[in-house]
Swiss-Prot record:
This is Peptidyl-tRNA hydrolase. Monomer. Hydrolyzes ribosome-free peptidyl-tRNAs (with 1 or more amino acids incorporated), which drop off the ribosome during protein synthesis, or as a result of ribosome stalling. Catalyzes the release of premature peptidyl moieties from peptidyl-tRNA molecules trapped in stalled 50S ribosomal subunits, and thus maintains levels of free tRNAs and 50S ribosomes. It comes from the Bacteria. GO terms for cellular component: cytoplasm. Belongs to the PTH family. The gene is pth. Its EC number is 3.1.1.29. The record marks 9 as: Discriminates between blocked and unblocked aminoacyl-tRNA. Its main location: cytoplasm. It comes from Gluconobacter oxydans (strain 621H). The active site is at 19 (proton acceptor). TRNA binds at residues 64, 66, 112.
Length: 189
């Protein structure tokens, strides 16, 4: 089993914030691949399904960003999921909007959700799907940027991008990370 976690904040008014792009990604994966209805457990919401022959547990921590690791740790321990089988979808300031990169391990780069996961898991050696939201230009504008909605002009591209991520998910399930990134880029173009 693989654990795919989308990071975000649970408030309904925050659902379209840039910081919630991880939630948006796992919601689209669940929808496109006919996963089970979301249910509350592990201090979050989970949905289960199969992609590319691989059983996937989707998780949206309902603990707010700063405590996301608590929820991920509970799910990983319950199902005995190794760190190499954990993937987190999160917003990334240092990538332009619409760009996506995958890496394993590394630092939190100021991201409180990743920092929480690093504290709660045995270490930082899980996979990260870094979803670019762009940088507002000055550090004083970062909070307003990540806690703001996507611009109306970005919405069509955002929807194509989320659909591309869901459509390419079978490659991610097989851990074909380079092929996944390439397919997302091609489908979202």
């Amino acid at each position: 089993m693989r654990l795919w976690t989308g990071l975000g904040n649970p408030e309904p008014g925050m659902s379209r914030h840039r910081h919630n792009i991880g939630f948006m990604a796992v919601d689209e994966i669940a929808r496109r691949h006919g996963f089970s209805p979301w249910r509350k457990r592990f201090r979050g919401e989970t949905s289960e399904g199969v992609i590319g022959g691989q059983k996937i547990l989707l998780l949206k921590p309902m603990t707010y960003m700063n405590r996301s690791g608590d929820s991920v740790q509970q799910a990983a321990q319950f199902f005995k999921i190794a760190q190499d089988d954990i993937t987190v979808f999160h917003d990334e300031l240092d990538l332009a909007f619409g760009k996506l990169r995958i890496k394993r391990g590394g630092g939190a780069a100021g991201h409180n959700g990743l920092r929480s996961m690093d504290k709660c898991l045995p270490g930082p050696d899980y996979w990260r799907v870094r979803m670019g939201i762009g940088h507002p230009g000055h550090k004083d504008r970062v909070t307003g940027h990540v806690l703001g909605n996507f611009a109306k002009a970005e919405e069509p591209e955002l929807e194509r991008w989320l659909e591309a991520i869901a459509d390419a998910a079978p490659l991610l399930a097989k851990k074909e990370h380079e092929a996944f990134m390439t397919k997302v880029a091609l489908l979202a173009a």
